[in-house]
Amino acid sequence: MQFIDLHKQYDVIEAKVNERIQEILAHKHFIGGAEVAELEERLAEYVGVKHVIACASGTDALTIPLMAYGVKKNDAVFVPSFTFFASGESVSLAGGTPVFVDSCRDTFNVDPKALEETIEK
């Protein structure tokens, strides 16, 4: 089932996308280049924050804040059980221990009662 017509959307922006890709290929600065800095600045302005870090993956996007927060060995980090594996993996990569907590059937978010019970264990 198609929800968004990405082909139609691309048709509208194709010339600009191709132009920018050619510029990047020409200067060969693929990682952390001027375009990444521009994206981070524009996103920071858009969401009203001082800093934005562009990430290569969702796993990086989950791991970096855990590292910045100072998660270390033996720190328990509570993670919803109904999730993608990167949610737990990122905790391990940051040095912590993922502790999975049952989710609410209606919302799929962490069940507050289950969280309380898990903390008490």
Predicted regions and their residues:
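Phosphate-binding glycine-rich loop
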Residues: K28-A76, S90, F100-D102
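PLP-dependent aminotransferase-like
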Residues: M67-K121
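Short alpha-helical functional segments enriched in proximate histidine and acidic residues
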Residues: E23-I24, Y46, T118
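N-terminal "arm"/small-domain region of PLP-dependent enzymes with the aminotransferase-like
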Residues: M1-H29, A34
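Alpha-helical elements of Rossmann-like donor-binding domains used by nucleotide-donor carbohydrate transfer enzymes
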Residues: K16, R20, E38, R42, ...
